[in-house]
Every structure is written in C-alpha cells, then in structure tokens.
Amino acid sequence: MVCGLTSCLGSGAAGGLFSSAVQFFAATQCLVGETWPKDSVLQNGSRYDFIIVGAGTAGSALAARLSEVANFSVLLLEAGGDPPIEAIIPAFRETLKASSVDWNFTSVENNITSQALKRGIEQQPRGKMLGGSGSLNHMVYARGFPSDYHEWASIAGETWNWTNVLKYFMKTEHMTDTNIVNNPELMVYHGRGGAIEVSGTNEVMFSIKKFLQAFEELGFKTVPDMTYPNSIGAGCFSHTIRNGERDSSLRALLNNANSTSLHILKDTFVTKIIIENGTAIGIEAVKDDKTFLFYADREVILSAGTFNTPKLLMLSGVGRSEHLRSLGIDVVADLPVGSNLHDHAMVLAFLVADNGTCVSDEAENSMEAIKYLYDRTGFLAKADNMAAYLPLSSSEPTVPEFALYPTCIPQFSPFRSGCLTLGLNEDLCTELHNLNQEYELVTIAAVLLKPKSRGKVELNSINPFDDPLIYAGTFSEEQDLDHFPRLIKMAWSIADTNYFRSKNARVIKPWVEACSNLTESAWIKCMSRAMVTSAWHSVGTAAMGTVVDGDLKVLGINGLRVVDASVMPKIIRGNTNAPVVMIAEIAADLIKEHYSVSRTGTNLNNMTIGNLTASSMPNISQPNINLADVIENNDMINSSLIEVEITNVEIITTTDRQSDIDDTVNVA
C-alpha cells in the first residue's frame, strides 16, 4: 500500500471502493506479461533431428513448424533470455534498444560517412532474447513489392517468386485491420486464419492525419493498405499487435507449440558448428561458463541473423578463404560469407513548428497506464507508423525506391535520450533538445529502399564472444547519395503545406562542421553523408545464389541451412520482419518435403479466398489486372488442416563422444 493511502481513503464505503480500485490496478500489472517457454534439462551430447541456432523471428517460427511433425526432434538455442514486459507493451518499444536485451552491434568507423553520429558509427540494434528483433522492433507489417521477389526468383528459383511467397505471407497472417477486412479488393491479398495478428487502429493520431493531408497536398494518393502490390502513395501501416500487445512468431507460434519433442535452451551461446567430412553434425555452445556439445542427425539450421549467422559460419571454416586463413582458421568451404551486406540508408530531416502542432495523444502518464491496465487501450497500446512511398521516376509509378517516415514530437519531450539511442552525436542531440524546449519538432526519416552500396561482415578475432566487424558500406556507391537532395527537399516541402504553414513550420539545418559554406544541394549531400545511418534492416550476408541455394542449403556442406534475413539476395522495399517469417514458413515446408513429410497447417494448394484459389491467383506483377473480375465476395480462407499426432521422442545421449562431455545442462 502506498504510504499514507489508507488514512486518505477512509474507512467508509467510498474508502473501501477506492481501495479496491487501487488494489485492482496494482494487481492487473501482473497480467501484463506472458508465460514464456521454459528451459529444458538436457544431457550433454544429446542428439536431435534438427538443431536451430537462434530463437528470433525466423527460429521461433521454424522450430514451431518443425515440431508439428511427430517424429521430428528439435533443439532450439537462444543466446538471450525471456523478453521483459516492455517487449509486450507497444509504446515501450524504444526503451529496449541499447539495453541488456539488445546485441548493441555497431558499424566500424570509416571516416567517410556518419561523422555526425556518435563516434562516427551506425547503431545496429538487434534483439538478444526470445523472439529476437521481433521482440523489439516497431511491429510494422510490410512485405515489400512483387518486383522484389521477381529479383529473388531470378537468382534462387521460382520458390521465391511473388505468387508463391504471397501464399506464405497469407498462411501466417490473421488480418483484423477493419480498413482492409471490409474491402474485398484488398482482402484478396490477406489471410484470416493465420497465427500472427495484423491489426489496425480506428483512432489514428492527430499528427498522422495531418501528415496524410500534407502528403495529399504534395501529390501523393492516400493508400488504405500499405502492403497492396503495385500501388504506392502515403498511408498508415498495419501492425503485429493483438489486443494491445505485441504479437510475433514467438508469441503466436513458438509459445503455442505443444510438442514434447521440441526442447529450448535459453542463455546459451553457440560458438561453433561442428563440421566433419563436409557435413554439419552438431554445434558447440557455452552455458553458465561450461561448454556443451549437441548433435544433429539431420540438419543444423542457422537463424542467428544478418550479423551472427555469418560470424558462426566463418568461425566454423565456412567463408572467404583469404579472410579465414588470415585468422588461422582452416577453410572448410570457400564461400563469400559476410559479403553483400546492405541496408536501407536513412537520413533525418528536421522542421520546427509552433506548440500545439502535434496535439499529442499522450495524456498524463498515469491515466494512460490505467487505461492500458484496464482494457489494453490508449497510447500505450499503439504503434502508429506511416510512410509515403516515392518512385524513382514517373515511368515506374508502382515501384517505390524511396520512403519518407514523418514523426511529430511535442514540446518538452524526452527527445534527447531517443536521439542518442538513434546514434546522433552529443552536439547534434543537444541542439535538437534545446529547440524542443521552445518548439515542437517534426522529424522526417528519408530512406533509400533499394541501395546499390554494399558492405561486409568479418570476424574480429577467433574469439566467438567478440562481436563481428560490420563494415556498413553506406554510400560506397555515389549514386545512392545522389538521390538525397531530391528526397530531403521533398521532406522539407511538408512545411509548405496548409496545416504546417499555419503552424509556422520551418526547416532546421543542423550544424555539421564539414558542411558549412555550401550551396543548398551540396549542403544536403554533405549533410546526408555525415548523418546517414541504418534503418535497422540489414540483409544479405549469407545470400541465396552465392552462399546458400534456393532451398537455403549452404553450398558445399551437407546438413547445414540458413533461415533468416541473411539469405535475402537483395533487400525488399519495406520492413523485413514479415518477410523473415515468410522465409521461415517456406523453409519449414522445404524441410518437410525433403524428408517426405506432409505439410501441416494451411494447405496452400487448396487455399481459397472468395472464389480466388492459389492455382488461379493473378500475376500481380501486371498492374493493370482488374481484381473485380476475380473477386465477388470476401470469404475467409478455407484451410485444409492435416492433424498430426505429437508423440514423445526419446533424447539419446551419445556414448562414442561421451568422453568429451562431463556435464549436464541443469536448468531451472
């Protein structure tokens, strides 16, 4: 009980009522949470059919799907632990970055870009907990565009063409955004029977409405569904939020996996893949300062992410021979592991405006907490994100190359901490913080969606606990930088629209020492080079076509696959979380088919939406298709489900290798 509260409430009926209310809200905070999967108690040297390294977005989905097969035994290892409560409440997403559940990766300083960032390096937040980055991202549901997957298919085969990947997006999706559900033309591209909820909001923030109006004035059409293929403009994203809480492959799939043949080890750091005679046979891992070995009878699968997957491959002898030999690592397979690193390049533009511009939905914090505890509504339950997609030219009006992401920041906001988390340097954050004491800030993230620049990931040393070296390579191709004068000027033009003009909005050009005394376009290029950072969507370091094949098998190594964002040969035009789930879903079916196991869950070949079946699904790469010709109603997906009996699987401890192993993993 709060000090002095008893005497304040009194002893009568009113006091009893208020006391009960206080106790109710104190108790309901305990209901904000999740019962996460428990650690297993395993014999050192235990054997499994499949060992999956990394319980992030991909690993959680893949482990859950493989565990649907009764005679598959699966071990899932995660370097982190359980997500904190902040990972569940949407509004607290930013507090997880630069925390103990973040790998806190950074790029290597190159003295060419990012001079306006702290230490001249780009921040690369990645989730180090169950759910991985799916437990700390912004929950934006984006898929990319059909042309992205036509590129993939040309490199890795027709498994990855748009028509096929769309079926897998729909398989996992449970769309509840009423703006989409009530529109048959939109719903033809969405699922209603999947595990992960994709929701909208009927209470769009005031500032978001004003941004949409501003973009409409600037010539953008308003798009009701930001995943709709071949249609670009400005609009609000749907989000993976269920009943006011973050949804993800962890919560929707792994948490609901009931198989006794799925074992999970948390706080377990995998240090090496064991490869013998060209075959991956297991992994080496450290838990509680002890080293353990586990063996895979069928496959080792890496789902450790764009930075840790190449690190593990290289530590295990799979990588560029010159780099491995320079560290004294025996080369098992000479592959361009770590190459092809690329990301959406992001530069911030700034406006200031009169107080009252944002009209924040953030009511007094305690009231928002009460609303959230009571019925999971209010500001804490939201993740309002919007964007405006821009084509490169009018000749390709349905394929975006750039995006603008605006945010309105009320006066006296705790902007400084977020600024530093983003990675801007102290001087710049202080300048913006001081402006926010007088004005409201508008930030517009200008993002290049299809960069040509490439970087790389290399080993720092042979110590597996050392972070990899991340050479971002941003603007290594000057052509990428050349786009930003146009893009930043488009962001600035928001100040000239009716509402923002009425609020005296004006452009702020932050002081960047290297960029003084330049013309406007030259200043923008200089500033962009100095301020550019990652949009936290890095991909490509174990790419299909060069490191893995179209079935995600590592070239030249038996029994080893990669299933995560690192396999993307080219980045998609949008946030990468939903595509990573899709990759895991496809991988699960590829593995089941390889071992002659029937697929489980939604029968994709019989998937029906309205009277549109998977076999008759239109080629969406043709923007002139008349969807009205193929849609007559908005029936829900008719899923053919295959029931699978889950049986206990005996975990066998090897005897021939037991001399190497003395301990048992004892987990509470």
Curated annotation (Swiss-Prot):
- Give the first-level EC class, as a single word: oxidoreductase
Q: Which SUPFAM superfamilies match?
A: FAD-linked reductases, C-terminal domain, FAD/NAD(P)-binding domain
> What InterPro entries does the annotation carry?
FAD/NAD-bd_sf, GMC_OxRdtase, GMC_OxRdtase_N, GMC_OxRtase_C
Give the required cofactors. FAD
Q: What is its EC number?
A: 1.1.3.16
Q: Which reaction does it catalyse?
A: ecdysone + O2 = 3-dehydroecdysone + H2O2
Q: What does this protein do?
A: Involved in the inactivation of ecdysteroid molting hormones by converting ecdysteroids into 3-dehydroecdysteroids.
Similarity remark: Belongs to the GMC oxidoreductase family.
**The protein, known as:** Ecdysone oxidase
Gene name as annotated: EO
